[in-house]
């Protein structure tokens, strides 16, 4: 695969001159220091490159609860980065919090439907509010598709993948919303 220009890269390799000119990582950030440095590189006219030929060794969290805590904390700090740098953040950083809001709205609507509360509503309103389930259903279908397409994984790995992926997205999104609300 060919190298390509990117907006940010984790585990980046930088020339010494980058730090001499732009300074080091922003130590006031507990997460996202790499993204912030990549932003300064781009704003100074530099380029960030992604090369699939480069490899790093990464040790993931040993337990599922620790993974959830990690992604929650990362979401909290991403909200701080959004607060500091606003529109310079990619739209993809808003997908996990929108997922959390969408799933929450879907759950509220489901409870209202199951308790019969929506029966008193006009038919057009019931139909309209039922549309709130579409994004959650699409997300669930995407997870099922990702698990299904994991050709090199056995059944156990696929089951974990089906649990871990939404756990990462939801915990990150919930952390982001908390970080946005509490500053």
What are these regions (language model features)?
Residues 87-98:
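Membrane-interface anchor segments at the N-terminal boundary of transmembrane helices
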Residues 1-17, 21, 30, 36, ...:
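A recurrent flexible, glycine/aromatic-enriched loop bordering the glycosyltransferase active site
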Residues 26-89:
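Catalytic donor/gating beta->alpha subdomain of glycosyltransferases that bind UDP-sugars
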Residues 9, 14, 66, 70-73, ...:
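Generic alpha-helical secondary structure signal
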Residues 99-182:
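Membrane-embedded multi-pass helical conduit in multi-pass membrane proteins
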